[in-house]
UniProtKB/Swiss-Prot annotation:
GO BP term, pick one: receptor-mediated endocytosis
Protein name listed in UniProt: C-type lectin domain family 9 member A
Domain C-type lectin: 120-233
PANTHER family: C-TYPE LECTIN DOMAIN FAMILY 9 MEMBER A
Length: 241
């Protein structure tokens, strides 16, 4: 009986000892994990904030780098365009200088009209000493790059009379005036009408084609198929006027 009481006493003492040993650790564990958890959360939040901050800064730096790159590209393009513009203008300047030098060298020899042609203002004249019909005379002038004489003013008429007659006076010369039918109006080759005081003298011709010629300071009408000398007119070289 005494041994059983001792055994029973031992059995009750063991649980009491284990409980007294476990309780301190159980009371300490929750507080430590809370601190660790809080610290971990703070670290995570800090890392997340740092990551977001660095991401924003990286994006800003990347945008700035791209802007700088685009600006450099634009500047390079503008520099290339400026260089090309300068090169072109340099070439143009050299070309102008060369043209000016050629003009200065040839200025003393510049003649506004071909050899043997007579100049009056912006026109050159030449009296051909071969006979042609009016139409053939017109074609011959076209081959020379000009047209039959067209008299637009009394002053031009006076010049022609004074100049041409000194060389070949007394001849009949076709000019570029014709009549539109036996009783029609008179026209120059360019379609304009002669001045009223420069109309050819009407000879009451019955020919189907009537043209005008110059003789003794007067315009006279005649059959276009008759043969006469003719006078051509062309524009003077503009650079020599």
């Amino acid at each position: 009986m005494h041994e059983e009481e001792i055994y029973t006493s031992l059995q009750w003492d063991i649980p009491t000892s284990e409980a007294s040993q476990k309780c301190p650790s159980l009371s300490k564990c929750p507080g430590t994990w809370c601190i660790v958890t809080v610290i971990s959360c703070v670290v995570c939040v800090g890392l997340l904030a740092a990551s977001i901050f660095l991401g924003i800064k990286f994006s800003q730096v990347s945008s700035l780098v791209m802007e700088q790159r685009e600006r450099l590209i634009r500047q390079d393009t503008a520099l290339l365009n400026l260089t090309e513009w300068q090169r072109n203008h340099t070439l143009q300047l050299k070309s102008c200088q060369a043209s000016l030098q050629r003009s200065l060298r040839s200025g003393s020899n510049c003649n506004p009209c071909p050899p043997n042609w007579i100049q009056n203002g912006k026109s050159c004249y030449y009296a051909f000493d071969r006979w042609e019909t009016w139409n053939n005379s017109k074609k011959s002038c076209l081959k020379e790059g000009d047209s039959l004489l067209q008299i637009d003013s009394k002053e031009e008429m006076e010049f022609i009379n004074l100049s041409i007659w000194k060389l070949k006076g007394g001849y009949e010369y076709w000019v570029g005036v014709f009549q539109d039918g036996p009783s029609g109006s008179w026209f120059w080759e360019d379609g304009s009408s002669p001045l009223s005081d420069l109309l050819p003298t009407d000879r009451q011709l019955s020919a189907s084609q009537i043209c005008g010629y110059l003789k003794d300071h007067t315009l006279i009408s005649d059959n276009c198929s008759n043969w006469k000398y003719f006078i051509c007119e062309k524009k003077a070289f503009g650079s020599c006027i």
